[in-house]
Amino acid sequence: MGEAPGITAQRNEHITNPANGELDMLFLFEHVDFDCEDNVKWKPLPLDLPQLKRIFAKQQSAVKNAGWASLFTGNHDQPRVVSRWGDDSTEGSRVRSAKALGLMLHMHRGTPYVYQGEELGMTDVHFTRLDQYRDLESLNAYRQRVEEAKVQSAESMMAGIAARGRDNARTPMQWDGSAYAGFTAPDAAVEPWISVNRNHTQINAAGEFDDPDSVYTFYKRLIAIRHENALVAAGDWQLIDADDQYVYAFTRTLGGEKLLVAVNLSGRTVDLPRDAAELVQHGVTEPDIVISTYDASHAVVSLANRELGPWEGAAVRV
């Protein structure tokens, strides 16, 4: 496994091709580097879904015949994906969007990577003061851009650090709702090096393990499906409608089997892309639903209406 900033999708195919004896997988970064103004990390932009789809399409197409893809949206250098591309403003939208983003990623062809806390829907830390941060990249960037070069206002820079700073992914893992989230004993003499996310009393592993509707339970199902279903593990990947602003849709095919994956990455009800709607025009039943972010009965109704609810996604046999 290699970390490969600057490596193209085409080069990834060569490096990960077993015949070349180099590496099994690479982390490519174009899909987590594009959503900022003028290539400045501290000037984040809203998600451009068509652009994200095109980047993933390049990565998927490059390894269609040889090589392999690494699937990730989070790591120790990236903000929490549910805060970045989802909606963590309410508990309901956090859970729904975390599931939608997980479904979108895990249904691609490749090996998914789950960064600690992603399976719980952990959010950005939402610090409001510079002295709460510990990452030198953020602290140095503030000094250089605000105090020395004066190319960015303090308010804009703090917003940029809050949205893209690496400390978002580096707060203690939220194991439970105790004082330090179970990372260390609640009565420990020494506090963790950085503050625990304040929402750890609501978002933690202990609270999600036995909840059938939790993000954690959904991720367990996503991982199980990849082991159970050869179509998900190895099927060919084909994008549907790169230009749709809200729905990320694609198919997986293997032999005579086909799976439609359609995920609404917005907080509104939207129409299915035409080509996706045509695949379900004769209707689907609950047994056809492999997995969905709502329940299967809701997915059946949504697909019959050729639409998806807020943050609704489904993988369905067609």
Question: Language model features by range: what are they?
Answer:
Residues 1-318:
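Active-site and adjacent substrate-binding regions of carbohydrate-active enzymes
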